[in-house]
Structures are given as structure tokens and as C-alpha cells.
Amino acid sequence: MPTVVGRVIDLNFEPFYIDMVRRGIVLQDVSLKDMPQALRDGVVSAGPVSLVDSFALDDVCDPVAGFCLAASNRAGSNLLYSKKPLEELSGRTIAAATADSTTQELFRVLLAEKHDGNIDSFVAMAEEHDAFVISGDDALRRRRGARGYQHRYDL
């Protein structure tokens, strides 16, 4: 019986291990937002999840030590575009252009820890907002800017 590892289709990385096929490792395409449920349902035995999602999976998964995804320079895949400077966003309306909970949590932590601020929740892009967070390929496509938003932050 093969070990099924989730390959996140909306990120620019892929899990690999030497001689995967010979070792009985099979990749299954899964969306990042669907990975936690795929792990819970047993569709996959392993796969990358966001740090935020990992907290809710400790009853069904064990973290694998020694592995992580990181960037030493600006990644450009978790962005905040704002009409106001970051330090003025506490209590303002913030939209989420993508459904990535990690990017939203990165923004919350940055605002709270660096600027002693907070927000209640994120709104849809169609609603009036002062700033928006965006992640993944959508953020990479908009890495040069967003019309009407003078401030850009790489979270």
C-alpha cells in the first residue's frame, strides 16, 4: 500500500524524496485550503500545511522535524496593499483577496506586535476597504503594485 503525500497545487514547490516510486510514495494533487481536511479524511497521509492550520491537526498528524519552507529574501507571495501606512491600519477595514489564513494571520501578528494594533475581521474585496492582503500566485502576479494603493508590504 503506497504512502500518499499531498502535492499543493497552488504553491510553487513540490514534495520530493529520492526514489519515491520505489519506496511506495505517491503524490496526490490537493489545494492548500483543502489539505487539512484531506489529512483528516485520510485522503493523504502527509502533506505541507500552513503553520496556522497545523495547530488544529495535532490530533491526527505529527509534525516532521527538520523540514520547513522559508525565504531568506522577500518572497513576494504574501502581500499587503494599503492606502495608508501600516502603522495607521489598526481598526481599519481590511479585505482578503485570497482565502489564505496564514497571510491573514501574518498581517494580524505584524500589526499587533510591531504597531500595537488590531483588526476584528477581514471583509470581501467587493466591500469598501482601506487595505487588502493577497497571497500565492495572485500576489506574485500583483507584485509590482495595485492601482490606488500607495503602500506595499511583503509580509
Identify the role of each PLM range:
Residues 8-91, 98-100:
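Short, glycine-/small- and polar/acidic-enriched structural segments
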Residues 39, 68-69, 107, 134, ...:
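Structured N-terminal alpha/beta-domain signature
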Residues 7, 29, 65, 96, ...:
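Structural signal for conserved beta-strand scaffold positions within catalytic alpha/beta enzyme cores
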Residues 1-5:
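Extreme N-terminal starter segment of soluble prokaryotic enzymes
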Residues 119-155:
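Pocket-lining segment of extracytoplasmic ligand-binding domains
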Residues 27-40, 116-134:
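Short helix-initiation/N-cap motifs at beta->coil->alpha
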Residues 13-24, 103-121:
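Ligand-binding cleft/hinge of the Venus flytrap
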